Amino acid sequence: MNALGTPQMVRQHRRTPPARASLLLLLAVTLVCGGANGGQGLPLDQITLPPGFEIAIYASNVPNARSMVLSPNGTLFVGTRTAGDVYAIVDRDHDHKADEVITLASGLNMPNGVAFRDGALYVAEVNRILRYDNIEAHLKDPPEPVVLNESFPRDRHHGWKFIRFGPDGLLYVPVGAPCNVCEGEDERYASITRMKPDGTRLEIFARGVRNTVGFDWDPKTHELWFTDNGRDRLGDDVPPDELNHAPKQGLHFGFPYCHGKKISDPEFGKKRKCEEFIPPAIELGPHVAALGMRFYTGKMFPGEYRNQIFIAEHGSWNRSAPIGYRVTLVRLEHHRPLKYEVFAEGWLQGSRAWGRPVDLLVHARWRHARVG
């Protein structure tokens, strides 16, 4: 299996006045088939999108690309899982194509999560959070990182982390369950935690979260929404993955006792009932591996997409008929899910996949003379 990565961009294909700012959707995809010269020559014509949209390669040769964060200056930072690397991707002339991919760090322990604040890059390993200060001035010679917190469990099963700063200025750090389904001894297992930017005052924000690898805040209410991956080995069609809504601290979302809205776990469900927990805001496809998610806050896409939720579905690994390998859209009305639909698909062809979406973000800095 080839673990190359290609950040790809989706944009509306229309004529745009010269020098008009546009906001595009940037998508991290891990390649599963060999060859393709690190992303060149990929069969992008197999990707189906709504009318008026197009997809293109933003950067090639980003092995094992996973989570992404964009600095205010436009540098794209990308974490990895198995590769152990962290990259900086630079587009100096803002022509929608990367000019250079720089390896900032190597040999890290599943550095999946990346976040950016006040000129510093934050990186999440399995058991610790690192900070690289003034990073954009030292892309070719990054400083030794500051270790902010190294108290997290060392389990690699669901140990890789997605991190982001919330509107409250705190860094949100999930801790996945160290198993398919179990009751963890450490209360931080199957939770979302948060801390101050200096690594202090770590606290649990939400419980009963099996393995979230993507979250975002509603741009209007500033409330947290997150994806969660359902347990395995209950069958092809159960349980669903979830999109959850956490308007406040202290909520429990069911794992390991309850899955989806009302599926009692055959092993742990006798201990607690589904009625005790917060149900998902909407159930997603079973085993689609819903990872990154973002509210679309741009203005380039038609108005119907503004403040709606895009989800990167990585794709199933043990389902009889593969599912996922796509980007889906959850349409909201009055901040409540109304519809769950496919936005982009084609990375899965029959029973074989050549790409697996991981994360997405809105790129606000690109300027161009014309699209179309």
PLM regions and their residue ranges:
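Bacterial N-terminal signal peptides
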Residues: 22-32
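Short intrinsically disordered, low-complexity coil segments enriched in acidic
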Residues: 2-3, 28-30, 177, 259
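General helical structural elements
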Residues: 15-19, 24, 70, 198
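Intrinsic disorder/low-complexity segments, especially N-terminal tails and targeting/processing regions
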Residues: 12, 31-34
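Beta-propeller domains with acidic blade repeats across secreted/periplasmic ectodomains
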Residues: 34-372
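N-terminal secretory signal peptides that target proteins for export/translocation
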Residues: 1-17
